[in-house]
């Protein structure tokens, strides 16, 4: 028994001695890449010239233009035809000229890369992490990651370092672990052990997240309210023209209060880092973001624009009315350094999807794509399946007469004995 137990250990030790350099060479290269980015990020408030570093020459970005539906098209807001925007294809030549004039005038409100993020002034809004008085700091160990996850974390850390959103930190009293969640694509059907076809979503990759649960547990909660969706939709309905805008990495535009930055520290295979800008995963981040947007668009909300998190819907009763409103909203964005994601902004369209509902001059309608998804849902076989079906169908209960009566047989199944 002793010889059987010792043999694998000896073999493993011999293998490591012979292949140690090969096993760790790739990991060393990854860590070296991270370290190369760190010197210039230690003082991100200084220009790179002041740090003795020659900035690399900036190249014009190249964008992969995805196919658009027939009612949308790409146009460019610069003479070199580098920076595209998405507008309605139904505009007349005169209307398109007027719209492009406004978009060129407010070019600074549109973001194309992370470098375009200037950061909203802390005087307007900054995120605070107020900890309960009797709470003790928590330092968690890093978690094991498979090679694919490590590559995702490495790329994300590099990207955030280069953008100045995170910085290395060595002495934080709060440390949270990194983990990766799967990004799921379309639905496919696979057989189970009983040869029954079960729909499943295909994992197409991974996304890096920070597990802030220990920090969130001892954080004082912010109860800033979100707008009522039904009231927003009513104000948007029956309008003729819309501009649907979206914040560019919205959370990353809000600064974390200086004394609270160490509480955002995370650990990964490449070191420990803290956030200068607000990360996803903090319990009060959505409330902070909604408060910030409400402050930025004060005087405009419920009058010319509807704001729900980082989705902004500018509307008007005519083209000229909507264009005038868009001019004021983009001007406010530039004044406050709020940057919009060009790829998710649609200008001067006659209809669009807002929070799962189709809005147009006709009023409020269901999103047909979501209805088809509900139709394809499998027959529920357990409590979880019943809740899923009721949740999806209940989203459109305003369009279904006597929904509570129709769904009662399913809701009865959820009652405890």
Predicted features, each with a name:
Residues 104-107, 111, 220, 237, ...:
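C-terminal reverse transcriptase regions that engage the nucleic-acid substrate
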Residues 62-70, 75-80, 115-138, 181-209, ...:
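Reverse-transcriptase-like RNA-dependent polymerase core
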Residues 255, 263, 285, 318-323, ...:
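Acidic, serine/threonine/proline- and glycine-enriched intrinsically disordered segments
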Residues 32, 62, 73, 94-114, ...:
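Inter-domain linker/hinge segments that demarcate the starts of reverse transcriptase
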Residues 1-169, 191, 198, 235, ...:
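An acidic, Ser/Thr-enriched, charge-mixed low-complexity segment/SLiM signal
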Residues 46, 84-87, 112-123, 167-173, ...:
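Short coil/turn segments at secondary-structure boundaries
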Residues 89, 314-317:
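Short beta-strand-to-loop capping motifs
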């Amino acid at each position: 028994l002793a010889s059987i137990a010792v043999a694998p250990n000896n073999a493993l030790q011999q293998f490591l001695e012979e292949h140690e350099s090969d096993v760790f060479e790739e990991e060393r290269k990854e860590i070296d890449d991270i370290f190369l980015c760190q010197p210039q990020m230690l003082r991100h408030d200084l220009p790179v010239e002041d740090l003795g570093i020659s900035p690399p020459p900036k190249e014009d970005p190249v964008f992969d233009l995805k196919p658009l539906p027939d009612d949308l098209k790409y146009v460019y807001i610069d003479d070199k035809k580098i920076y595209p925007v998405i507008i309605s294809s139904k505009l007349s030549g005169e209307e398109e000229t007027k719209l492009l004039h406004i978009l060129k005038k407010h070019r600074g409100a549109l973001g194309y890369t992370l470098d375009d993020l200037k950061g909203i002034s802390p005087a307007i809004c900054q995120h605070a992490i107020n900890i309960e008085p009797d709470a003790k700091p928590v330092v968690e160990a890093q978690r094991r990651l498979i090679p694919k996850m490590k590559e995702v974390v490495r790329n994300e850390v590099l990207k955030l370092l280069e953008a100045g959103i995170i910085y290395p930190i060595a002495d934080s009293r709060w440390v949270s672990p990194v983990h990766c969640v799967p990004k799921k694509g379309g639905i496919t059907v696979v057989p189970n052990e009983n040869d029954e076809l079960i729909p499943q979503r295909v994992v197409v990759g991974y996304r890096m997240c920070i597990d802030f649960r220990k920090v969130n547990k001892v954080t004082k909660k912010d109860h800033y309210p979100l707008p009522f969706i039904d009231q927003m939709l009513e104000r948007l309905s029956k309008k003729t023209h819309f501009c649907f805008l979206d914040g560019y990495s919205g959370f990353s535009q809000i600064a974390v209060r200086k004394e609270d930055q160490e509480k955002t520290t995370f650990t990964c295979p490449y070191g420990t880092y803290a956030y200068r800008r607000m990360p996803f995963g903090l319990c009060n981040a959505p409330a902070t973001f909604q408060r910030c947007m409400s402050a930025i668009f004060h005087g405009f909300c419920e009058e010319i624009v509807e704001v729900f998190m980082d989705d902004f819907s500018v509307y008007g009763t005519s083209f000229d009315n909507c264009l005038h409103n868009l001019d004021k909203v983009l001007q406010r964005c530039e004044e406050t350094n709020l940057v919009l994601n060009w790829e998710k902004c649609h200008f001067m369209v006659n209809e669009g999807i807002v929070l799962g509902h189709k809005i147009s001059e006709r009023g409020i309608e269901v999103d047909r794509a979501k209805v088809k998804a509900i139709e394809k849902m499998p027959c529920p076989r357990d409590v979880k399946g019943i809740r899923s079906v009721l949740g999806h169908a209940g989203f459109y209960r305003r369009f279904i007469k006597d929904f509570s009566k129709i769904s009662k047989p399913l809701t009865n199944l959820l009652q405890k004995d």
